[in-house]
Structure formats: structure tokens, C-alpha cells
Amino acid sequence: DKILLAEVREEATYVKHHKKKIVLLFSAMRHFAKALSDDGFDVIYRRYDDDNNQGSLLNEVKYACSQHSFDKVVVTFPGEYRVLKSMQQWQHQLGIPVEICDDDRFIASLEQFSEWAEGRKQWRMEYFYREMRKLTGLLMEGDKPIGDKWNYDQDNRKSLPADVSPP
């Protein structure tokens, strides 16, 4: 098994991003790749400035497939619908099976959210999160939220004190 991580132009430029955001994301990817490698995983890492960078996720996967004999490609369910729609075509484009696995980094699955949203006239995420917190026990003390407040939106709307500079 190999793990492919790729910094690609398509993902960095599909909408205008602040340069510092792109630097943060690429830095996080590089640190994650190193951690995986240090843990013994076989990592293929494609930097944005690599001479042979293919420019898109699909093209990087195609290139990796041309360099190695993979039986299938396994990806994590992406956080963006446009990426999901692209990945759903990869099996046809690559000629090998593509498995899209659930992303367990979220508090709920897409199915759980769909079930919650069905029949509701208004989707207020705060109420969904309350249900998920009760279900999972996250940030809960018994059946009450930690600190007896469901959210701190009012506190988050306050201006940063003048004597504090952001990092």
C-alpha cells in the first residue's frame, strides 16, 4: 500500500485563497506526510513545485498508477461536493476500482445529517450539533452542555481587546 498526498494547482486556485491559507494547508500536508512516513507508511508526496507535478488530483492519481501497479485506489470521502463528483468518475477514468471511504473526522456521517434534515423547513446547524453532542456525549456533562451553555456565539462576536495582537 502507498499513500499519495499531492499539492496541486487545481485545488490551490479553483477559488481565490489567501496565500497564507495555502501555505498553512501545504505545511500541514507536509508535516502529516512526514508523520506517516515516520510511522512506517510508504508515502508518495508530490510538492506544488515538483517539475513533474500533474496539476490536479486526478492527474496525480493517474501518474501514480502509471508508476506502480495498484489493484485499486482508496480515498477518503472529500469535504467538497465538487471533489466528490470528480472522484465518482475516477473508476471509469483510471480503469481500476475506486473505493470512497467514510471520513471519520466529522461528528456525524452524511447519512445522519440527511436523516436529521429530512422534512425540516429550516436547517439550523446549532440544533443539529446539539443533537450530535447529546448522542456522542461530546462537550457534555451528563445531559447538559459543559458550562451550561450550548454555544458561545455572543462571546465570539466581541472585538479582540486592543492590547492583544493576533498570532
Feature roles, as predicted:
Residues 21-24, 28, 53, 79, ...:
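Catalytic cores of large soluble enzymes that bind and process phosphate-bearing ligands
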Residues 56-167:
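Beta-rich, aromatic/charged-enriched effector core domains that present basic-aromatic interfaces
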